[in-house]
Amino acid sequence: CIRDRQYNMMPRLQVSCTNENLVINSNSVPHYSFIPMTPNDLVERDEEWRVPLEPTLDPSREATNIGANGPVVLGYMGFTNTGLNIFGPTEGGQPANQAYGDPVYNNILDDCGGHTAFAYHNHALNIRCFNPNGLSSNPVTDPQPEIIYFSLIMGYAPDGFPIFGPHEYANNDGVNVIVPESSYELIDGENPQIN
């Protein structure tokens, strides 16, 4: 679906606070070069997200955004700190031959983990596209600026809780950054989305 078309749009991101909320306004345009991976055009779409400055846990702790066909996570799950929607890991019901499919496997995501539908959005997050020390128009192929500090937060969920990247501080000094090892273990025969 690659088309030879120039997209001359500039990203817009504004952040402010009220007494209770972080308010983010964006036009849903990525800060890097847009590569069409679907037949949908890149369009500006005004977004405003309001998340609480002091998030609290939902007492019901029930799964949200579950599809009608069982544990299929669809649609809006949060937003990036660069002003783009984050959607669930699966696609919607169209096209029928890829319904609820894996957008990575179906090769419909750009190098930063996003594509267009109603507007540009991410299904996956590539840490190279979130380097706070210098934004690049081609973050995957351009040389990366030296990482002086890490942005531990890559975005926010609608409830205000941060979405963290792969780095964390080794201790409370705010200096030593590490990539922690996961203790996640997949048990044969169990679906990790529902257990």
Regions found by a protein language model. Give the residues of each.
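Solvent-exposed N-terminal domain segments of exported/luminal and surface proteins
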Residues: R3-P103
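Generic structural hydrophobic/aromatic packing signal, biased to beta-strands
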Residues: W49-V51, F79, C112, N122, ...
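Short, recurring structural edge motifs at helix starts
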Residues: N106-G114
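Domain-length functional cores that host ligand/cofactor binding and catalytic or interaction surfaces
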Residues: G114-N195
